[in-house]
From Swiss-Prot:
Substrate binds at G26, N27, S43, G44, S72, S73. Catalyzes the isomerization of L-ribulose 5-phosphate to D-xylulose 5-phosphate. Is involved in the anaerobic L-ascorbate utilization. Keywords: Carbohydrate metabolism, Isomerase, Metal-binding, Zinc. GO terms for biological process: L-ascorbic acid catabolic process; pentose catabolic process. Binds 1 zinc ion per subunit. It comes from the Bacteria. This is L-ribulose-5-phosphate 4-epimerase UlaF. The keyword Isomerase applies. Belongs to the aldolase class II family. AraD/FucA subfamily. It comes from Escherichia coli (strain ATCC 8739 / DSM 1576 / NBRC 3972 / NCIMB 8545 / WDCM 00012 / Crooks).
Amino acid sequence: MQKLKQQVFEANMELPRYGLATFTWGNVSAIDRERGLVVIKPSGVAYETMKAADMVVVDMSGKVVEGEYRPSSDTATHLELYRRYPSLGGIVHTHSTHATAWAQAGLAIPALGTTHADYFFGDIPCTRGLSEEEVQGEYELNTGKVIIETLGNAEPLHTPGIVVYQHGPFAWGKDAHDAVHNAVVMEEVAKMAWIARSINPQLNHIDSFLMNKHFMRKHGPNAYYGQK
C-alpha cells in the first residue's frame, strides 16, 4: 500500500498547486480493487505539513485499517462511487471557485467549446438538492447516492465529473492523478463557460459533430491524439 499512499499524497498536493484547494479544503482518494482498500486524505490536516505516511487506508465499509488520523469526512461519498462504478480508480472533491459557483447556481456546466469536449462528452451535470432527511441522515453517503442517481448507467469516464447542488464538484479518473487532472480541467471549463456566457448570454452549445470529433479523437476506439 505504500506505493498507493505515495500516489494519493502526491495527487492531494496537486490541489493547492493548481489552485483547487484553500486551507484544508479538498480530498483525493484511490482504490486498490484487488485488496478492496481505499487510500484517502486525512480529515482537516494542512497541506503544508501533510506527509505520505498520513494518508489513511480504509476498507469498503469505511473502517480504518491503517493510519493515525481520521479519514476525510467525504469518505462515504468516495466509497459509494467506487462500489457503483468499477472503472473508477481515483476520486477528487474540491471547492474550486468556478465549478463551485455552477454548483451553487444549480446549473450544469454547459459544453460550449472544444476544450470541454476533449474531456467531457456533453454538459457536466448538476445533481438535485438533497432533502432535509438526506442531509440529517447519512449525509456523505447520500451525496454519493445523488451523484449516482444523476449519472445513472452512463460510463463515468466519459463525463468524469459532476457538480453537487449547493455543494461543489467531484471528479474521477483511472487513478488519483487522472482524477485531479479532470478536476483541473473542470475548473477551467467552468471558468470559460461563465466568461463565454457573460460575453454572449444567447450562446448555444458546441455543435454535436464538433464535440463528437474532439472527444472521440482522444477517447474513442480509433483515438489518435497523443503518442502510443
